[in-house]
């Protein structure tokens, strides 16, 4: 068992360098740290991810992320995968991969109606659910740009939240202790529509108390970012997928902005 309060006991070997639960935490950690989602287990899940350990107590903690879990379950079922925290499923939701293409449109549509029919007006419910046949996928970008954004008018505060909440990508320029200087394309409002501007310099956090998930990032590397936090170093395949699914869901959101 992992002593999530501090030191660790003997740790079981993992079947892969980055287990699905560990990757999930890399992305969920900062919004949870900011009290936007999940339970009150921030330091515990952080320690679990640092140790790369998966145990039943951790899974119970992660299931408190009620915004993400239905998408993970949907992706897993659509691909015949039993474990919603399978590494491929987790990557599909946060970054994007081919698993998203195997989820049936009707399943996403039905899931959205089941989840949000009591929270949204009939007009907004149909607007959101109709994005499934319009090409939306069960990706975090869709959740941010279309499900979360149920406002009639975008302003600066909402735009900043969308930009922080989406998973973005940046290229490392320099390293400064627990921070990185990166070049990142920001989300902007242009002509009343969402768009991505050319990359701009930005400072992001990669460590808390000297610990993080991208300790070996080097200048030139691509990293993923969530609420100003460096989630992990990306391969070129992952970066390309993240950009592809981000641009897809920006375009789909713009259909009703």
Residues covered by each model-derived region:
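Short, basic/aromatic beta-hairpin or loop at an interaction surface
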Residues: 187-207
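Short, Lys/Arg- and Gly-enriched loop/turn segments at beta-strand edges
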Residues: 228-241
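N-terminal intrinsically disordered, low-complexity, charge/repeat-rich segments that act as generic
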Residues: 2-157
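Structural detector for short beta-strands of small beta-barrel domains
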Residues: 160-183
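Short, well-ordered loop/turn sites that connect or cap secondary structure elements
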Residues: 216-217
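Short peripheral tails and domain-boundary helices/loops at the edges of structured domains
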Residues: 238-257
């Amino acid at each position: 068992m992992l002593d999530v309060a501090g030191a660790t006991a003997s740790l079981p070997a993992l079947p892969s360098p980055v287990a699905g639960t560990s990757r999930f935490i890399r992305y969920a950690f900062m919004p949870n740290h900011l009290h936007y989602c999940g339970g009150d287990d921030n330091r515990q899940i952080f320690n679990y991810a640092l140790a790369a350990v998966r145990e039943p107590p951790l899974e119970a903690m992660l299931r408190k992320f009620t915004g993400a879990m239905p998408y993970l379950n949907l992706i897993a079922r659509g691909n015949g995968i039993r474990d919603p925290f399978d590494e491929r499923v987790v990557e599909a939701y946060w970054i994007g991969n081919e698993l998203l293409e195997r989820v049936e449109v009707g399943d996403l549509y039905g899931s959205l109606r089941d989840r949000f029919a009591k929270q949204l007006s009939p007009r907004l419910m149909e607007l959101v659910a109709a994005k499934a046949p319009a090409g939306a996928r069960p990706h975090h970008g869709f959740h941010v740009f279309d499900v979360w954004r149920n406002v009639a008018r975008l302003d600066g505060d909402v735009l900043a939240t969308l930009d922080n909440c989406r998973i973005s990508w940046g290229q490392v320029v320099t390293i400064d202790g627990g921070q990185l200087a990166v070049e990142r394309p920001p989300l902007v409002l242009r002509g009343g529509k969402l768009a991505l501007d050319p990359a701009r310099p930005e400072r992001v956090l990669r460590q808390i108390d000297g610990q993080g998930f991208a300790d070996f990032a080097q200048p030139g590397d691509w990293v993923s970012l969530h609420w100003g936090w460096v989630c992990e170093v990306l391969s070129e395949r992952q970066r390309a997928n993240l950009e592809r699914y981000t641009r897809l869901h920006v375009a789909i959101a713009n259909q009703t902005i």
